[in-house]
């Protein structure tokens, strides 16, 4: 029931990454399915707590996205956060892009200009959560090769619905899950 703006890994890339890490976690881990691997740009709260509907947020996101260019970068290593959630230690894949901080700040500034009250509990660390594991061991690593990735679209996830806005001067669209749970 959450709302976020995110960059989703292209499915073929996500499936390749998932093949490298899915067997590295024990059964107590909550592993992110390949079709849900994403880099969160903004978390906007819960659908039950917002005055904005998906249509309004997507209209704004599309307006912003038309003025942006695709983001280039690379997958660049695996890490963990020190905070522990009820599911365990978050283990993530990093995404390195010199363009990403300004891109994300532009999005923050744009949504604030529309009147959204955005609150941040910590700084922006670009990451793609692979799993939450209660049994994390120091020194444990997953070897994910550096891979160039260009994100050409940004996604508004509003509950279970995904709305996709192309970066640059293209139209966006609404996406639903198929029978296998893929978008």
List each model region and its residues.
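Histidine-dependent nucleotide/RNA phosphoesterase domain, centered on the 2H-phosphoesterase fold
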Residues: 1-183
């Amino acid at each position: 029931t959450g709302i976020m703006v995110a960059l989703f890994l292209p499915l073929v890339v996500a499936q390749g990454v998932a093949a490298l890490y899915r067997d590295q976690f024990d059964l107590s881990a909550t592993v992110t399915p390949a079709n849900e691997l994403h880099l969160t740009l903004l978390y906007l709260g819960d659908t039950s707590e917002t005055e904005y509907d998906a249509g309004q947020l997507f209209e704004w996101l599309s307006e912003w996205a038309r003025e942006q260019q695709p983001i280039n970068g690379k997958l660049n290593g695996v890490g963990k956060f020190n905070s522990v959630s009820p599911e365990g230690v978050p283990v993530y894949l990093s995404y390195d892009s010199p363009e990403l901080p300004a891109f994300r700040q532009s999005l923050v500034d744009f949504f604030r200009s529309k009147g959204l009250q955005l609150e941040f509990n910590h700084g922006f660390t670009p990451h793609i959560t692979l799993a939450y594991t209660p049994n994390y061991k120091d020194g444990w690593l997953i070897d994910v090769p550096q891979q160039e990735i260009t994100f050409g679209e940004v996604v508004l996830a509003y509950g279970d619905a995904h709305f996709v806005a192309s970066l640059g001067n293209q139209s966006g669209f609404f996406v639903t899950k198929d029978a296998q749970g893929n978008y």
